[in-house]
């Protein structure tokens, strides 16, 4: 297959490209900077969709960048980097003389309302209660194509765990130093997925003709934030009991953004499993041991 990957130069895109190449597929990236095996977003807008069998969009400014203040400027970047790239790809697919057979978008579990008791599968309601859930609703709407000539899949991803990037890039040092612990109360759910499995689900969605609609990109075993901290500490052979106070999280990220760390959702990959995807890392302990090894 020839696969076009928007925003493919980041942590998830690199893992997906490696897996697709290993499975014999040809990958072209869409990015801001030109280079071998790439086209730019401007080229896509001007020349339309290059010939491809499938397209994926992973583009989006990192919401939890601690170096960026949560102000109106950054919020516009967060929204624009997702909606504009998705709209551009969707428009290019619609106009293509031979549209791709599959179109996959990665969004987030922020669609579901944080809760200490609720359990969410792909059919659960959401998408209308705060900044982030509304963003996911608009983002997924931007990807929708008229007709059914192209198979459409949305993967709502949890926190992506992997070596050399993503959430682990910020967390490993304090945990290695024995200074790690739960965030806030630690009671909030922590919907997670190993980078290998997120790349695996995306590849499964591209290759399997029966897959369509929403898939939850989370591991089948749920954990709270405190359980995650304890399990990561154990994988490193360190104690992990020093909590990061809610007030500190709110001071660094702003109240609205801090919700993503201080509250969480129990998300079940019901449809993902039903499509036949087999997880490489269904359990948190094994996933973290592989990452820190």
Curated annotation (Swiss-Prot):
Binding annotation for NADP(+):
31-32, 58-59, 77, 82, 160
What InterPro entries does the record tag this protein with?
DUF1731 (IPR013549), Epimerase_deHydtase (IPR001509), NAD(P)-bd_dom_sf (IPR036291), SDR39U1 (IPR010099)
* GO molecular function ontology, one term from the record: oxidoreductase activity
Sorted alphabetically, the keyword list is:
NADP, Oxidoreductase
Report the EC number(s), separated by commas if there are several: 1.1.1.-
Q: Does the keyword Transport apply?
A: no
Query: Which Pfam families does the record associate with it?
Result: DUF1731, Epimerase
Domain of life (superkingdom):
Eukaryota
Q: In which tissues is it expressed?
A: Expressed in adrenal gland.
Q: What SUPFAM superfamilies has UniProt attached to this entry?
A: NAD(P)-binding Rossmann-fold domains (SSF51735)
Gene Ontology terms: cellular component: mitochondrion; nucleus
Into which family does the record put it?
Belongs to the NAD(P)-dependent epimerase/dehydratase family. SDR39U1 subfamily.
Role noted for this protein: Putative NADP-dependent oxidoreductase.
**Anything else known:** Despite its name, it shares more sequence similarity with the sugar epimerase family than with the short-chain dehydrogenases/reductases (SDR) family.
PANTHER family, per the entry: EPIMERASE FAMILY PROTEIN SDR39U1, SUGAR NUCLEOTIDE EPIMERASE RELATED
Q: What is this protein called?
A: Epimerase family protein SDR39U1
């Amino acid at each position: 297959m020839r696969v076009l990957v928007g925003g493919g130069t980041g942590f998830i895109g690199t893992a997906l490209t490696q897996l697709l190449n290993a499975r014999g597929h040809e990958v072209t990236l869409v990015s801001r900077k030109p280079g071998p095996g790439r086209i730019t977003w401007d080229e896509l807008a001007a020349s339309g969709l290059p010939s491809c069998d499938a397209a994926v969009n992973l583009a989006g400014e990192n919401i939890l960048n601690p170096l960026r203040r949560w102000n109106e400027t950054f919020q516009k970047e967060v929204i624009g980097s997702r909606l504009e790239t998705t709209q551009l790809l969707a428009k290019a697919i619609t106009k293509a003389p031979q549209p791709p057979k599959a179109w996959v978008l990665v969004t987030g579990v922020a669609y579901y309302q944080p809760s200490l008791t609720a359990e969410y599968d792909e059919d659960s309601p959401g998408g209308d209660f705060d900044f982030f859930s509304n963003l996911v609703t608009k983002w997924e709407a931007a990807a929708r194509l008229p007709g059914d000539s192209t198979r459409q899949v949305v993967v709502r991803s949890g926190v992506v765990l992997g070596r050399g990037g993503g959430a682990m890039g910020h967390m490993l040092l304090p945990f290695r130093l024995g200074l790690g612990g739960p965030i806030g109360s630690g009671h909030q759910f922590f919907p997670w997925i190993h980078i290998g499995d997120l790349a695996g689900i995306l590849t499964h969605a591209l290759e399997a003709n029966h897959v369509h609609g929403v898939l939850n990109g989370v591991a089948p075993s749920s954990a709270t934030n405190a359980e995650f901290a304890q399990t990561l500490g154990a994988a490193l052979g360190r104690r992990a009991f020093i909590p990061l106070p809610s007030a500190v999280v709110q001071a660094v990220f702003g109240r609205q953004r801090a919700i993503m760390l201080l509250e969480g959702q129990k998300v079940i990959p019901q449809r993902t499993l039903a499509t036949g995807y087999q997880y490489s890392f269904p359990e948190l302990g094994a996933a973290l041991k592989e990452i820190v090894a």
